[in-house]
Swiss-Prot record:
Name assigned to this protein: Transcription elongation factor SPT6
Compartment(s) of residence: Nucleus; Chromosome
Annotated source species: Mycosarcoma maydis
Region (Disordered), start-end ranges: 1-247, 1632-1723
Entry similarity comment: Belongs to the SPT6 family.
Principal location class: nucleus
SUPFAM superfamilies: Ribonuclease H-like, RuvA domain 2-like, SH2 domain, Tex N-terminal region-like
Known role: Histone H3-H4 chaperone that plays a role in maintenance of chromatin structure during RNA polymerase II transcription elongation thereby repressing transcription initiation from cryptic promoters. Mediates the reassembly of nucleosomes onto the promoters of at least a selected set of genes during repression; the nucleosome reassembly is essential for transcriptional repression. Essential for viability.
Residues covered by the SH2 domain: 1363-1445
Amino acid sequence: MADEERVPAPYFQDDEEGGASDEGEGVDLIKSHGNLVGSGGEDSSDEEEDDDPEEARRVAEGFIAEDDEEEEEDSEARRDRRRRRKKKRKQNEQDFEVDEDDLELLAENTGQPRRKEAGRLKRFRRGSASPPADDEAAARQRTLDQIFEDDDEDEDDIRSGRRGVNYDDDDEDLPSVGQALRAGVARKQREVVGAYEDDGLDDFIEEDEDDEEMQGLDEEEREARRQQRREEKRKARLSGSAADPAKAGIDHEAWDEIHEIFGNGEDYFWALEDEEEDAFDEEKKNKMEYKDIFEPAQIAERMLTEDDERIKRIDIPERLQLACPGEEGLKLLERKLTDTELFEAAKWASTRISQRTAAEFLDEAGLFHRQRSEFINAVQLMLSYMLNDLLEVPFLFQHRFDELEHLTFDEVERQYRSIDLLTRRELYTLSGLGLKFKTLLVRKDQLRATFNKIHVDVKTEPIQDDELDGGLDAMPADESRAARVESSQRQRAIFEDMLAQAASLEEISDITEYLTLRYGQQMRDAQALTSNGTDQAASDLQGLTLTSDPLVSATPAFKKPSLVGQYERNKKTVLAELAKKFGITSDELASNVTSHTRQYSPRDPEESPFKFAEQFTGSAWGAHSPEIALAKAKMMLSQEIGKDPILKREMRQLFKDAAEINIEPTERGMTVIDDQHPYANFKFIANKPARLVPQNPSQYLQMLQAEDELLIKLDIDLKDVVLTRFEARLYNNYASEGVGELSNAWNEQRRDVIREALKTHLVPNGRIWLKEFLREESRETLLRHVDVLMTKRVQEGPFMSKSMMARNRDPKIEEEDRIPRVLAVSHGGGDPRKDVVQAVYLDERGRFREHATFDDLRPLSARQMQERELELERTRGKAEFVDHRADFVKLLKQRRPDIVVVSGWSVRTAELKRHVQELADTAHQEICDADRLHSDLERDQAVIDVVTCHDDVARIYQHSSRAAEEFPELSELGRYCLALARYAQSPVNEFAALGSDLTAVILDPNQRLLPQDRLRLHFERCIGAVVNENGVEINQAMTSTYLQTMLPFVAGLGPRKAHALVNAISTKLEGTLINRTLLISRNILTFQVFQNCASFLRIEQDMLLEADEDDVPDVLDSTRIHPEDYDFPRKMAADALNKHEEDLEGEHPSLPCKELMEDADPADKLNTLDLDNYATMLFERKGERKRATLHSCRTELIKPYDDLREKQSEPSLEEMLTMFTGETSKTLAEGFVVSVEVTRVQEGNRMQEGHIKCRLDSGIEGTIEAEHAVEHYTPGSVRLRDLVRPQQTLDALVRKIDYKMCTVQLSISPWELQHRATHQGKTPIDIKFYDRRKADQWNEHAAAKAKLRIQARRQNRVIDHPNYHNFNYKAAVTFLRSQPRGTVVVRPSSKGDDHLAVTWKVDDDVYQNIDVTELDKESEYSLGRVLRIEGMGSYSDLDELIVNHVKPMVHMVEMMMNHEKYKGADEEDLHRFLTNWSLANPSRSVYAFGLNKDRPGYFNLSFKANRDAAIQTWPVKVLPNAFKLGPADQLADVAALCNAFKTQYTTQASMARGAKTPYGGGRTPAPGMGGATPLGGRTPYGGVRNGMAGSATPGQGVAGGYTTPMINVASATPNPYGGAYGRNGAAGGYGAPAAGGPPGRPPSMPGAPPMMPPGMASGGGAPSYAPPFAGAGEPGPPPARPPVPHGMHPDRFAQAEYGGASQQSYGENSGGAGGYGGGYRGY
């Protein structure tokens, strides 16, 4: 061979890449220095040096010419350096040589014979990726196994389960790569060489030799032996002695001469080794690793850890590897179940799959009970596929569906009927159960191995005295050998029986704990040996927890039993003999209980228990008396009974069937859990059966969460009657059947044993187990519910617009529209001041094409139009305006989207949608006119639909880093629009792209109760089901990172394998996959992964250009058909086209399929085939069920990869309202009372009724019609502006919700407010199991404790201030009584720790309380940094509050009291003064001031207009440095106050003369006796704020001139009728009648009566309509019915007459016969 032909080449070199020419030609395996090619000794630099003989000559000459002394020094230094380097590294290099033994082993494992032949090393034969043209008929008959034999050479490695080496194969029949894939060696998948990167094929055969030759050696000795072998081979390689001279064309004689002349090279070996080590160290120094650059967290995030690399290269689906992590998990996956184990697994799993399968197939009364055997067989077969063949659920559901259905033929209708044996969701459940059963088998094997170590087989081995330590039933040392043999066999039989019955990991743990109890130290020693690695085979799976699967991870890890030292100590004493005298053992008791017969009965000793126990007393073992001895013996027995696995299983079942749940709130829970708290639902639950928990899983999960928060105590227990019954059952099987005093005495001792076992062991164990069992059951139930919700979302396909459906109906258009063109529009929050409208357009392939921005899409208002006209006039028509609406229409006409998606997160989105719909209609009309579209079909094709889609994914996307990386040029709102458009085209794509943010999608509020990893697993399953159902176009995904996000959900793949797949296609196939076969032939995927994912990777044929002869497209690669089934569609197509084999000779096997799929009507041709008959023939001849497969092939040939998803629909109106506003049915519903702000008041007229426009906190617009604001409303009867004003806050009742317009109809009618929904804001309770009695007791108790706690806190609180005292109000008054006026006391408040009360002395027996709110508190006892007085201001400390707030009010009080018009604190003296002065001056008015004792901080301004007028009183409020009268609140002194009074009085008198109702006027209620104000003469009611209504008296939210504000009236609507519109409904409107008055009735809300000042009506004298009520001290009956006063509405008068006025007041209700139901004393 020429020199240029002997270029070193990799073992596996593709023909395309050069290197070795063809299979018949060998490769030079000897390098110029004698090294084998591929041995690892060469690199690129070495090859360059070897190719230059001159350079080699100079190096050799320089080497030989070295000085001897320098040579010795250098060599010594090199040797020292070499020794140091050997200590630092484990291995110099890997040996690639494969000898004859290796080839023999490979042939043996593959089952292929090989011919013994000395000669060159061989390699695997190669095949082609596609069958040759001259052998198409044979190719069509190939099975999938034969396809995979055609593995092409590749330099990376062979996709096999074991490591292998490829050799030239000219004349030896070695197994193909496909056969090696299925060789079945022990570490098939686990040790596969990386499928996507070069791995030097290290130690392929060497490790097998380790298994055989190094038996019995520990790990260090094995490693030393391996190192020695590597060193020997390396030296041989370096010296060339390992090379076969025949391979280099040198015969043995010439080779011997070379050795005689030059030696074997060992003399200069040190020099070569030193150079090699230098190069090794230099390479190691220069080599950069990930860990040298990135942090560990970054490496893990990028999936570059060693575990990630292992997952990539192992031939096991990634999701299975993640479900079973680590080496132990891999061993679990590798274990193949036998047919017997599969049958047992099927029986075990079939009862746990679902309630449906249990009810329909397993229940004898089930609908399909006759198909029970078919169901079990299907379960067994699916488990075989999952556990042995490692096939994932999507593959099984798609390609093994024939095994998942049972067919019955209806003879009457002559058609098949199908019964679903397993659904897709049930298959996922079965997958988890299969892994769990595998784990169970491994645990059993471990436990059996441990038992075999500690248990002595007395038949074959001698027994030592201390070896048979088997518990209390062990035979004593002096018994015969036969008895010992029998005891040993019985113990083994018991153990095996327990192990066979164990059906869960908990029961395996029970058996382990039982063995530990029985065998004590022996068991612990065996476990210690296992945990220390002495018996590695038994401990490989110790501690394995399958973390990813919900069913498997539900089971806790293998728990080690606790030590029972006291039991063991007593067991080694004579007390064990005493315990044995009680009768039967725990094993025998368990046998009696489970068999329901008394197989074993105890025999009573002949002495009484205490007398019999005397012989077992002794201080050595602590039994000083018979009582203590019996107690210790009973403790041992109860422990054995309590630890018996069978009895524990019985107790668990009892708890599962009969346990009850009781909840008791803690002290903290009583305070925290109110009626609005989510936990209020179960706050007082009692006796709820545990079996009902799955009906409401979220409730139980909330219970556990509340218990973790220390808010409740969760108790799960049995009823006394149930526990007593079970105790009797145990006792009856444990007690003796004897009668008499002696038997009774012993049976009482036995009863004590049973009770102790129950109390100490069985019941606590059952309680703990059931608690965790219910947790897992609840989680699984809730996960299934969320699974259904997610499936519903991801199963939606693209929107199908009216235009798309019209184009699909058009016969002129051949290509079917599947994906719409989308324009997404949003203005985000919808604030016109800052939010613009943004639009993003995507074409039908999902490509981002345009982004546009518009300031506003609303039509111009009349004012804006007028402004534009004026601007045009000013500029003489030269002004230019931007018409955003026209621009939007232009965009629609240009892009012609099929749909426009409108969404956002404000209520204004609904308005935007209406505007967009208008513009879309305009654009449609203009398109039709421009294109002259006349027919309905043509016009429909131009329709632009306006829709709304779910935006939860878009909201997540807009803030994500992924969005910023993909579209940095877009704003967040633009990215939001882009995500909306993508969602409209394919929801599953958007969900798949979320990645780790997937669980941020809230489908159910209770999903927060679930573990996030399990929730994500179920979400990914839902996405994976849809992704695999619709496939992934692999070549499109290669060019789109967005589409690549779906690859991890393909069966067999995952994030790591999908990433590796993309990289492999990019590097090996230049980024384009021509056909599916290349995935395996080019070593892109390994066998198992390919088997799972092949049919879900779609290859669109119109995107491909034919490559070379081998790599040609296959039309079937664009279908759901798996390559293993390609023969079926090929045969079907050929038959449908009437083609024969000779017609297809030399053609591609799928040519008939291509012709059929391109046919105009393939369905008609395929309908001629009898597929059912063909399926029957296949089953009869080959035993293959292929009916569903054949019908699936038929469907795919007609419509390849047809989208099976349902077309996407808009969210419901309720869902849209929640999207736009955040309101849900729990926050907004009819009958709810909500807080609204008045935005506009529209008065009524003859044309329309008046109304009030409001806005809710969520932005929803509301309307209050006048008739729902005022009872019996008529236009003109009352001014709505007199009732409410803009920016005022009201409480309104929701009458009706318009979900489409996002508006509500409201009412503020007191009558309707009274009928508010009682359940608003409250958490519904579990009424069936709610303990009312306990709730009432707890509430009373909690109220009392809260009161005491508040008092204690008040007493304990200390504030460092001279004015602070721990006083209550009474104590403060007592203290201030002797203090001067203006003294201040700061004290604790009854409102809580964040309030203070400031009490100051106004006058004798008059004290004002000021409520101070503390803000910014460090703790509950510290003083707040901000002290706020509501409506007055905030202060930084107490000194500032006293100086700037209290002292100025004291000054104003002193000013008033020193004024000449102040007449003291006695109201009678004030009235007497006014009356006397009026009598003296009958034609003049008079006024004076007095102190209001009922309302500290207020003065009374009382006046008489003339002698005959009644005394009226207006309130004067004292403010810091000011008085307040009506709207005037900055009156600096008494003079200013008097002037304000005169001004306001004159203004109201003028209004009264014009018969106009004063704005907000409110009358002073007439007293019951004496001095009554005429009903017409109303004291102005100041139900308005400052600056409103001129002279109105300041309103306080209740009827009357002035009163203390009613509770929570801060935002009440002022009104003249007693605060009927206050925040608390009708609290002041028409409450309880005055004492002695008739019951109140709903007021009829007419207009307010006119103000009639004294002296202004009826010519200035006494009012003509003044009622003749009796004066003070002169009681007398009123007239039968007084006349209706002038100007007063009759309904209003009737209301006053029947006592409907407000009763909330300060002062005493006179309520006498002469009153009208509630006047105020002295007013």
